[in-house]
Amino acid sequence: MRPLTPRQAEILELIKRNIADTGMPPTRAEIARRLGFKSANAAEEHLKALAKKGCIEIMPGTSRGIKLTQENTEDADLGLPLIGQVAAGEPILAQEHVEQHYKVDPAMFKPSADFLLRVRGDSMKNIGILEGDLLAVHKIQQARNGQIVVARVEDDVTVKRFEKKGNKVFLHAENEEYSPIEVDLANQSLSIEGLAVGVIRNGDWQ
């Protein structure tokens, strides 16, 4: 199989997770919404590229007409991908970020988890998110005040409590030793990579 671009790998992982969670593939509109595309047409172009590379089959005439090839059907049974160090500028679910897969049922979290992120540092220790824990993350592009999010500020990925005030976003630590990260949306880049939906204590799942 020809190598995938980071974005193609991210879409393929989303398809696998949706099938694992719901028993069916996502629609083009759902892919576009989950990954922040402006239209379903953008998702369609990526799906065509995945089909050309032998990862999926596209069945015309239905909004969920996406079928994993046998190789990728087997991969979908591996479990949730564990994301380690995230390279600057790369999609968080790019294949090179996946350290391994864990046999965890995504549906045990509400909403269901799309991936696990290895926690680095102690900035969220006061709410029980500790160094080395595996944070279960539901991939979504928007957040409400008070939610714990995985956010990308410029090229750095961080786990913090989200608060938006006007044109500014404050990312709050749950550790008094850390000051909030202030992001001025007028001149700084911020994107939400997902919502924290649970924690697996380091060592609980091997």
UniProtKB/Swiss-Prot annotation:
One of its GO terms (molecular function) is serine-type endopeptidase activity. The keyword Oxidoreductase does not apply. The active site is at S123 (for autocatalytic cleavage activity), K160 (for autocatalytic cleavage activity). The record marks A88, G89 as: Cleavage. InterPro entries: LexA, LexA-like, LexA/Signal_pep-like_sf, LexA_DNA-bd_dom, LexA_repressor, Peptidase_S24_LexA, Peptidase_S24_S26A/B/C, WH-like_DNA-bd_sf. It catalyses: Hydrolysis of Ala-|-Gly bond in repressor LexA. Pfam families: LexA_DNA_bind, Peptidase_S24. GO terms for biological process: DNA repair; DNA replication; negative regulation of DNA-templated transcription; proteolysis; SOS response. Residues 28-48 bind DNA. Keywords: Autocatalytic cleavage, DNA damage, DNA repair, DNA replication, DNA-binding, Hydrolase, Repressor, SOS response, Transcription, Transcription regulation. Its EC number is 3.4.21.88. The keyword Acyltransferase does not apply. Represses a number of genes involved in the response to DNA damage (SOS response), including recA and lexA. In the presence of single-stranded DNA, RecA interacts with LexA causing an autocatalytic cleavage which disrupts the DNA-binding part of LexA, leading to derepression of the SOS regulon and eventually DNA repair. Belongs to the peptidase S24 family. Homodimer. This is LexA repressor. It comes from Shewanella halifaxensis (strain HAW-EB4). The gene is lexA.
